[in-house]
Amino acid sequence: MIKAVIFDLDNTLLDFIKMKREAVLNALLSMNEAGLEIEIEDSYKQVMSIYESEGWEHQLVFNKFLKDKIGYVDNKYLAAAIVAYRRGKEANLKAYPNVHRTLNHLMKNGIKLAIVSDAPSREAWMRIYYLNLHHMFDAVVTFDDSKERKPSPKPFNLVLKKLGLSKDEVVMIG
């Protein structure tokens, strides 16, 4: 019998790709409006390439972009990028349709809920709180907890331990 449902966070409960895309585009447009002469489409590809090589949660992506583009970090452009990125992220950080309703339905039926995410702990928890999902989960395991990414069994074994359940009593979505 299923006693718990384990979810991935990004691109399962929320549209991480859309949020990241819109936030990066906002940042690039803002730097351009601040006077940085860039081609938005090419610059977008460059920023996404930095994320792909450094990790999707890389905090210094615009520093690297500016160093590559103009040879140094201009704080005017950096500030424009960071503020616009945060605003774009916040505006596009949304749960998929029916996520809250589905989670509430599972909870009301006595099903435990958990998250296994490859995101760093702080970023995962910020998204969970921002979406007002923090009170719904019995266990959350992030990369910082397990030091290994899916599909490694380590994060799954850790969440099973936190839930006090066996692999035969859970289902993973994501």
Residues covered by each model-derived region:
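A general structural motif
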Residues: 2, 110, 167-169
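Active-site phosphate/pyrophosphate-handling residues
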Residues: 60, 101, 154
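Short alpha-helical
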Residues: 22, 101, 122-123
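Catalytic-core regions built around general acid/base machinery
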Residues: 98-110
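N-terminal helical cap/lid subdomain that shapes the substrate entry/recognition surface
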Residues: 2-97
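Substrate-recognition "cap/lid" segment bordering the active-site pocket of phosphatases
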Residues: 87, 91-94, 114, 120-173
